[in-house]
Regions:
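Structural motif
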Residues: 16, 55, 62-64, 71, ...
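A short glycine-rich, His/Asp/Glu-containing loop-to-beta-strand
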Residues: 10-46, 52-53
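Acidic/histidine-enriched, glycine/proline-rich intrinsically disordered or flexible terminal extensions
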Residues: 113-144
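Ligand-binding loop in jelly-roll beta-barrel domains
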Residues: 84-111
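Residue-level recognition of conserved beta-strand positions in structured domain cores
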Residues: 34, 67-69, 76, 84, ...
Length: 144
């Protein structure tokens, strides 16, 4: 049994990611991170996960998820399961900052993914989308 200690906040543009549990903490069963999204922030392009599922639990604000062309709006306390292979994206159209927990099962997505994307996105100027796509591919994501 492990108690996770507070970890770094990884900033990808305006979005903040903070891992609470990594796959190494759970024998690979899951990874868990908190995501903070200000209103009208640039968000990830539509994508799908090749090797894992994602479950979202809304903590604060209202976040809209587009999953396989269907628009779903989550309020605090609501959850959403995104199956492996489902094309999805999220956006904060509201006036308050959104916070949600994302659980990755199995726990194969590490903070390294977000660190690598942050290095490209936060470099200044338009992000190198080809480079972001390469990073995504190495970590089990496909742009849609």
């Amino acid at each position: 049994m492990n108690i996770a200690m507070p970890r770094e906040v990884i900033r990808v543009g305006q979005i903040e990611i903070r891992y609470l549990l990594e796959g190494a903490d759970t024998n690979g069963a899951l990874a868990l991170f908190e995501c903070t999204v200000p209103p009208n922030a640039r968000v990830p392009a539509p994508h799908r996960h090749v090797t894992y599922e994602e479950t979202i639990w809304e903590i604060a604000g209202t976040c809209t998820f587009l999953v396989e062309g269907r628009e779903l709006t989550l309020a605090p306390g609501q959850a959403l399961f995104i199956p492996r292979g489902a094309a999805h994206q999220f956006v904060n159209r509201g006036s308050e900052t959104v916070r949600f927990l994302a659980t990755i099962t199995p726990g194969v997505l590490s903070p390294d993914f977000f660190r690598e994307v942050a290095a490209v996105v936060n470099a200044g100027g338009p992000p190198d989308l080809k480079r972001v796509g390469e990073i995504m591919g190495r970590h089990g994501l496909q742009p849609v």
